[in-house]
Amino acid sequence: MADPSAAVPRPQSDALDDGEARTPPLRPGGYDPAQYAGCVVRSAEAAGVSPLLVMTVLHNEAYKPHHPLLERLWQWWKPGASFGVANMHRVTFEQVRRRYGLSQRWHDLRDDPAFAIHAAALHLKDLDQNLPERHVRRLSRDELLALGYNAGERNMLAFARGVPPGPMARSYLRRFRAHRSRAATALASSGGHRDAAEG
């Protein structure tokens, strides 16, 4: 079996030799997922998932401040809370880290938005590989993947079989649908990526 880490290299978010802009730093009260559109496209394409899916998940996860200092305070107040611009929990991150041989640690998610986006794209790739092609028609594949990102793979598979999502999952799904057009606009504004028109 091939080493999964060899197939999905980490995008070089701070490389300037190819004309790409650096990943913008996080500022207190100034987080906008659209600022990371270039990083989203690179990470999603490296992982083989839809940039629109990744960007919409980032918009859904933008409900709390993501400045590294604020994340440290949040972690002190609520141990076990998720980290990074994509709000990844430690257990999920450790699964992704082991599978892809990532050298960074979970705490690095809070200080490195590009790494957090890369880890989120890899997790969405894993969810996509485990989601059957046939599933209930009332939920799109991207909606099921977003629910899997939020509620876990086991719940995603249950929703795919037709189990109705509970109140928290329904709330996440409503926000995901509402953020879809904003995510598409962010991607289109960053260079007109083809997935932006498919939402």
PLM features: residue spans?
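Catalytic glycan-binding domains that act on GlcNAc-containing polysaccharides
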Residues: 8-199
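Boundary at the C-terminal end of the N-terminal hydrophobic targeting segment
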Residues: 2-7
